[in-house]
């Protein structure tokens, strides 16, 4: 076997190439097959083998007497690195319990310190001289290999020695914290460099490795902060607390042990514990920031707060963390309220503005009323209409805005009650069990949340429900959707919403069914809905509105709102019970006609002045009002029927109003209003009866010997038709009153347009219409008859034809 192969076999190497070894990183060298089972057998064996190799080359190394006495010859580069690595040494300050041979350690350290400069120069000279005696390339390669490994060992050892020397020299001046801050990075790098040594046998190395042992013992404490941060990141707070307990036990154990060995080393352990405490404080601060920044998840806040107090019972310097966390949630919820309410205010305002620019067909009030009365689904009945969209938008506001906030507040309120009762503090450390137990402070936070929510709702809906207006939707539609929204809301918020919604309904009710312009024009009273060809009579829906309002605005009622409801009730009925009067009074017109009949007409008939009679009749007719729209007697009778029904229902309506919305005030009376409206309608009916009848004019030559003239018979036929209309449309008393008034007016019209027939048939008319005319008109007819007789106008005296006339009105029976 050659010399190279013997070297390779002895050291377990595969190659003597220097490039192979020097290009490898430190961890590769650490894992090499060189015998490094212990620092003693590794380092000192390297030194002895280097001397053997030198001697096998046949060279005689020149060494000093002091150096040869201290031990084997050390190469000059090793001595030089050793001298720099042991200033100052720990041999005079530290005695490590694990060191078995302190005398040998001091001897080795003394050798490094006492080696003179001339011996180092001689050794260096011997090494260079022996290099020329080497006979093989393997020898050069092995020396280079040994120098490389030994240089790495010396570099790592030198770092540890220098760092620890700096620690020892500055502990008493700068303190452990500042010193360790300066040296931790260097220590970490040195520990990585020394991974090639077996840590189990470190205590057998010289005094510099005693220093390393101390640092490794402290390293366990310095690794805890990283574990703490990892557990905090993973939110494994139970493991974190367990590791904190382990760190505390290790700290107490190491501190007690090192205090016995060397009290100065306690500074190092104390500093490690200070770093641990600072890490814990940082983690607690981070957890507290998470609690303050959490938004809406109060369950997370409570759970995290429990973990925080277990780590640090006093996280915010004596103040109540439970109270502060609750206040933080209160601030978040308030911001959430402002954000959500502002969003819905914006979209509702946009919808109202857009709708005002559009012309949409409104839902028929009659259709809605029938749907409500029959319990139909308005969403389906009104599908596709803007009223449904507006109503569903309010329902979305209740669900996505109000109810979401209320649920958050309820959660805070529930946890606040549990904190006040001490349920949540059961798992808290003893020093933190008093947190959150003040009912006044915790109650103030919850009450403030509720009051803020109420203020937001009040501001949103408006004092009179301005935000709730559904683009002029029919009052029953608004009531339907307002009721659906109110059913979703909790009690206190429902009260605020209901008051505003009730005022909005009251305003809409009066606006739609009691407009100020409704009483200005008679023709407007008879406008018919072109779509449905029906008119919803407001008095029909009074009970429906009151019933729905009673569901919407539940007790306790505020007096001013109840007064507004009463005001709207009477205003709607008052407006619909009012019928305007005409510009000309039919009573005055009739009186003028009878005055003419008793004077001027007699003269005209006596002198047969037909031209003046026609002129007078035209003048009296044109003095009556003319309507641009077609109004019939049946329309008037329908309106009369409504008023009569309203008068008959008024007392039940008033009782229902007082039952649903009690008010200790005297109810106004509508009887005078209804009576006046009926008189105005009666005048209109008389006017229409005159307009609808055209009497044929007669001349003296056309007067026949018959007892009843044709125009007189036409008058009786018209009165028969009117009698039947009134009998079917009114109660007996009202029908009789209207029949008498209409007969008198028709007779005046008859006298104006057919004076010859009138004067000829006065006796028959007085006899036949005895029950159909008021006493004043009967007396007036007798006076006219006497004047006619005095003027040589001979009226007929035939009355036997009464039995042959089959007119029902003559008897005036309406029952």
Swiss-Prot record:
UniProt xrefs under InterPro entries: EXOC2/Sec5 (IPR029175), EXOC2/Sec5_N_dom (IPR039481)
Subcellular location field: Cytoplasm
CC per GO annotation: cell division site; cell tip; exocyst
Quaternary structure and interacting proteins, as annotated: Component of the exocyst complex.
Biased composition (Basic and acidic residues): 43-54
One BP annotation, GO: protein transport
Domain of life, per lineage: Eukaryota
Family membership noted in the UniProt record: Belongs to the SEC5 family.
The name this protein goes by in its record: Exocyst complex component sec5
Keywords: Cytoplasm, Exocytosis, Phosphoprotein, Protein transport, Transport
Keyword DNA repair: no
A Pfam family annotated for this UniProt entry: Sec5
Main location: cytoplasm
GN (gene name): sec5
Location of region: Disordered: 37-74
PTM-bearing positions, type Phosphoserine: 50
């Amino acid at each position: 076997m050659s010399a190279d192969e013997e070297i390779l076999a002895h050291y377990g190497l595969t190659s003597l190439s220097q490039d192979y070894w020097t290009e490898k990183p430190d961890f590769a060298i650490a894992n090499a097959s060189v015998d490094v089972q212990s620092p003693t057998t590794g380092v000192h064996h390297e030194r002895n083998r280097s001397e053997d190799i030198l001697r096998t080359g046949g060279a005689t190394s020149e060494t000093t007497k002091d150096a040869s006495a201290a031990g084997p010859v050390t190469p000059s580069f090793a001595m030089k690195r050793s001298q720099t690595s042991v200033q100052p040494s720990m041999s005079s300050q530290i005695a490590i319990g694990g060191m078995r041979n302190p005398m040998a350690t001091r001897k080795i350290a003394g050798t490094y310190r006492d080696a003179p400069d001339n011996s180092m120069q001689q050794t260096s000279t011997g090494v260079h001289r022996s290099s020329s005696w080497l006979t093989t390339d393997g020898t050069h390669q092995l020396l280079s290999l040994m120098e490389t490994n030994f240089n790495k060992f010396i570099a790592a050892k030198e770092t540890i020695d220098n760092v620890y020397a700096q620690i020892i020299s500055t502990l008493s001046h700068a303190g452990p914290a500042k010193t360790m801050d300066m040296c931790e990075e260097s220590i970490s790098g040195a520990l990585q460099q020394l991974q090639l040594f077996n840590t189990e046998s470190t205590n057998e190395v010289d005094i510099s490795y005693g220093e390393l042992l101390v640092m490794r013992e402290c390293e366990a404490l310095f690794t805890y902060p990283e574990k703490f941060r990892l557990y905090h990141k993973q939110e494994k707070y139970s493991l974190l607390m367990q590791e904190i307990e382990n760190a505390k036990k290790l700290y107490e154990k190491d501190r007690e042990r090192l205090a016995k060995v060397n009290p100065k080393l306690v500074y190092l352990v104390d500093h490690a514990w200070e770093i641990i405490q600072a890490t814990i404080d940082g983690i607690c601060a981070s957890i507290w920031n998470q609690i303050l920044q959490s938004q809406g998840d109060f369950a997370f806040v409570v759970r995290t707060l429990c973990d925080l107090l277990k780590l640090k019972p006093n996280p915010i310097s004596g103040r109540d963390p439970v109270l502060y966390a609750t206040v933080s949630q209160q601030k978040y919820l308030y911001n959430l309220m402002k954000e959500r309410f502002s969003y819905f205010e914006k979209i509702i305002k946009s919808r109202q503005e857009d709708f005002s620019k559009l012309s949409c067909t409104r839902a028929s009030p009659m259709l809605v009323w029938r749907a409500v009365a029959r319990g139909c689904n308005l969403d389906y009945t009104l599908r596709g209409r803007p009223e449904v969209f507006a109503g569903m938008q309010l329902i979305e506001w209740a669900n996505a805005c109000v109810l979401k906030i209320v649920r958050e507040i309820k959660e805070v309120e529930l946890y606040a009650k549990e904190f006040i009762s001490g349920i949540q503090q059961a798992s808290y450390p003893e020093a933190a069990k008093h947190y959150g137990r003040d009912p006044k402070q915790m109650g103030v936070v919850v009450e403030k949340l509720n009051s803020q929510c109420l203020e937001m709702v009040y501001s949103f809906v408006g004092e009179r429900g301005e935000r709730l207006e559904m683009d002029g939707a029919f009052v029953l539609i608004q009531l339907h959707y307002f009721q659906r929204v109110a059913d979703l809301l909790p009690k206190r918020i429902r009260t605020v919403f209901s008051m505003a919604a009730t005022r909005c309904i009251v305003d809409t009710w009066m606006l739609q069914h009691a407009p100020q312009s409704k009483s200005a024009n008679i023709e407007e009273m008879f406008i018919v809905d072109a779509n449905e060809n029906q008119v919803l009579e407001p008095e029909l829906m009074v009970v429906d509105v009151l019933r729905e309002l009673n569901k919407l605005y539940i007790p306790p009622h505020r007096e001013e709102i109840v007064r507004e409801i009463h005001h709207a009730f009477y205003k709607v009925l008052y407006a619909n019970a009012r019928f305007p009067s005409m510009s000309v009074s039919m009573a005055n017109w009739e009186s003028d006609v009878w005055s003419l009949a008793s004077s001027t007409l007699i003269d005209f008939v006596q002198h047969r002045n037909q031209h003046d009679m026609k002129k007078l009749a035209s003048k009296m007719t044109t003095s009556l009002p003319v309507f641009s729209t077609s109004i019939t007697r049946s329309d008037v009778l329908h309106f009369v029927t409504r008023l009569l029904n309203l008068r008959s229902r008024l007392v039940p309506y008033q009782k229902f109003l007082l039952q649903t919305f009690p008010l200790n005030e005297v109810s106004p009376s509508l009887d005078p209003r209804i009576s006046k409206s009926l008189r105005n309608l009666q005048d209109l009916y008389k006017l229409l009866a005159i307009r609808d009848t055209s009497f044929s004019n007669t001349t003296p030559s056309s007067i026949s010997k018959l007892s009843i003239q044709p125009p007189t018979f036409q008058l009786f036929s018209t009165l028969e038709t009117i009698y039947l209309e009134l009998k079917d449309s009114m109660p007996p008393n009202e029908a009789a009153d209207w029949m008498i008034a209409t007969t008198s007016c028709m007779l005046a019209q008859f006298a104006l347009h057919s004076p010859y027939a009138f004067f000829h048939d006065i006796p028959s008319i007085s006899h036949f219409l005895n029950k159909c005319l008021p006493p004043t008109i009967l007396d007036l007819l007798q006076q006219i008859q006497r004047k006619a007789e005095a003027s040589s106008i001979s009226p007929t005296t035939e009355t036997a034809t009464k039995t042959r006339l089959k007119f029902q009105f003559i008897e005036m029976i309406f029952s």
